[in-house]
Amino acid sequence: MTDSLSLAEARALVLDCQGLASRSTFGSGSAGTKKAIEHLGYVQIDTLSVVARAHIHTLWNRVAAFKAADIDTLQQRGAIFEHWAHALAFLPMRDYRFSLPMMQRIASGESHWYKKDPKQTRKVLQRIREEGPLTAKDFTDKKSSDTMWARSPSKRALETLFMEGELMIPRRKNFHKVYDLRERVLPEGVDASMPSQDELCRHLIVSNMRAHGLALSSEMAYLRKGLGARMAQTAANMVEEGVLQRIRVGDQEYYSTTENLNRLGQKQPSPKLRILSPFD
């Protein structure tokens, strides 16, 4: 039998699991910021700033006394790293291994934004190996055109090496990525074993349940290349195992967990208005 939730109950569950019931849910400062990113699974990075970048806004809404410098502190300590979730994001370093499948696909020849230029990537990699961490501005070659998305050969090589995992971002300088070799950035002891597809799907499902409270399998596989059918099958298997359960909200059936459903009614949402970023 499929249990059901009212729209109001579903909304309350999502707000609670998203950490929006209170600005003290995760604590404060860099420790609270780390806890928030680990709970949410990732926070999308915003390259544009009008009032504030979206990732700053997202964390400010959840972490008491949050400052943008808290992200810098965590990144330089190796507690979080940058890579691709459904978009460029800050991710918990504890989840590093779950980015390896995408890195492997790019390294095996799949294009992300640009077709790989092996000669250029070797040249860029050699400079960083010899000179240490560099930004794109440290390379003086020019882009091929003035169009919005045009990039210089070195910038394309940096992004390819970053997506492959050969380069990581130990810090940003005036929000420009600083690139360095993975072996000089990845903390010792981080699990770098390649997950199976089943492990990856289970990780994404557990992360979604923790951060959202309920979700469709299609939402959990959003922009995760090639995982749609496997995600649906893994979610169904987890229902059989008693890890997930099916929940109906209106005409739509979602997945949730007993633990999440037991949260209903335990906390009253804050009556304060929260203005959320469109990326949130």
Where do the language-model regions lie?
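Long, low-complexity intrinsically disordered regions
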Residues: M1-R274
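Short, intrinsically disordered, charge-balanced linker/junction segments flanking boundaries
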Residues: L276-D280
